[in-house]
Amino acid sequence: VQPDAIINMAHGRMGDKMVDYLKAKNILLFAPLTINSLVDEWEKDPMGMAGGFMSQSIVTPEIDGAIRPFALFAHYEDEEGLRHSYAVPERLKTFVSTINNYLNLNTKPNSEKKVAIYYYKGPGQNALTAAGMEVVPSLYNLLVRMKQEGYNISGLPANAEELGKMIQAQGAVFNSYAEGAFNDFMQKGHPELITKDQYESWVKESLRPEKYQEVVDAFGEFPGSYMATNDGKLGIARLQFGNVVLMPQNAAGSGDNSFQVIHGTNMAPPHTYIASYLWMQHGFKADALIHFGTHGSLEFTPRKQVALCSNDWPDRLVGAVPHFYIYSIGNVGEGMMAKRRSYATIQSYLTPPFLESSVRGIYRELMEKIKIYNNSHKENKDQESL
């Protein structure tokens, strides 16, 4: 038997021998979650799962290499008040699509695969950011390697410096007050323009009505006030090279507290944030999603801690797309959140090495003179003692 994937519904580990087998055969391992409560209770629970049940359902399967801790089963009550565990219908549909999408990555030619890569960038001319990484050169190296592996990345510039210039021009992020820069971008930056009909069809496919109402209550009707055109469309910044698209991750909330906006607010994300991910799923039709560097805000959007339901933002924004996250090996805690809340398969990168620092210019000269002075003073004392 040579399976392409294994779906393990048992709790706990499968063991080291099984891990060796999975590695040798390059077999995907999925461990969907069984919720030990009624569907309605679970959907309202902000934790999703906790304690020993979480350990045996999520933590230990991760040791075996299981990915995508996707809540699939929950309890239903019959007419006599007896509980039975069944697959949640809407979850089952998404789970099957997800498995098929992962398997397609093994069979689809690289030249036909569509990949969406999100990066993190401050407003205006701010540089791309990621903890412990030079982002633009690293991103360029990835694109070059993908091109060598047969991916369609037409139009890739000759070097990382040129890529950086293109990102500043076409993949920018704007403050809400930067109207001049925004207007210039809409004319010259080649944004993806999303219409009301497109957006609402994607929303209908991905979000429950009450979930979308949270967005309208917070930010008004589509397109909102940010990145909106005069004719009622929404602009999404992106650079497209053949079948690969690079996109900035927009702010997941509003306000001046950037730490809180990134690390989680209680509000629904704005239209621009949602539209970007829904376009990735339904417009661009990505075969794979990559978040590049540590870290973004997707894994911190509301609501549940783990065992997400179809009413939680990360679950809806990732959809059934295989998700890969280039993440620092030095940030284990938040990396686990990315794995469990945004269904990311983590690809670790090393933290930068520590080097001994030296002082600069005139300060180095000053340090040398202080050292000479101290040594000469010590020599005089030694002579006096003799």
Language-model features and meaning:
Residues 1-386:
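An N-terminal assembly and electron-transfer interface module characteristic of large anaerobic redox
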